[in-house]
């Protein structure tokens, strides 16, 4: 599957380090509650892809879901690609960075959260960086 930013796995391994590589390139996950962004709720700013720095989520779309991972109800337009994921005997939708293909987490719909999309983007903190400064996209 092609993405605008492509690198060899050796390049990704070197740039990301072991934990981010495991999560972002090997589709791993963090332990629930272990991520640095799980309990942070900034009012402004953006969350970007930890691998390629692509803007992904406005801080204003982050919400408390009590699931153990950072949760967002929507991504910036065109920034997160949805891929059907039937691994581990489950039907889920994987969220990946539309620029580099890095694994972010999964997207769940119809869980009854009172947000504008009724979606929960359950995202690994290791897949994100936070930028507090305002941008044209937030």
Curated annotation (Swiss-Prot):
Active site: 122
UniProt-annotated binding residues for Zn(2+): 49, 52, 97, 100
One Pfam family, short name: SelR
Cell compartments where the protein resides: Cytoplasm; Nucleus
Residues covered by the MsrB domain: 9-133
Recorded GO MF terms: metal ion binding; peptide-methionine (R)-S-oxide reductase activity
Names of the cofactor(s): Zn(2+)
Any one Gene Ontology cellular component term annotated for this protein: cytosol
Entry-linked InterPro entries: Met_Sox_Rdtase_MsrB, Met_Sox_Rdtase_MsrB_dom, Mss4-like_sf
GO biological process: cellular detoxification; cellular response to oxidative stress; protein repair
PROSITE patterns attached to this UniProt entry: MSRB
Cofactor binding note from Swiss-Prot or TrEMBL: Binds 1 zinc ion per subunit.
Keywords (A to Z) from UniProt: Cytoplasm, Metal-binding, Nucleus, Oxidoreductase, Zinc
Similarity-based family: Belongs to the MsrB Met sulfoxide reductase family.
Full protein name: Uncharacterized protein C216.04c
Organism this protein belongs to: Schizosaccharomyces pombe (strain 972 / ATCC 24843)
Lineage: Eukaryota, Fungi, Dikarya, Ascomycota, Taphrinomycotina
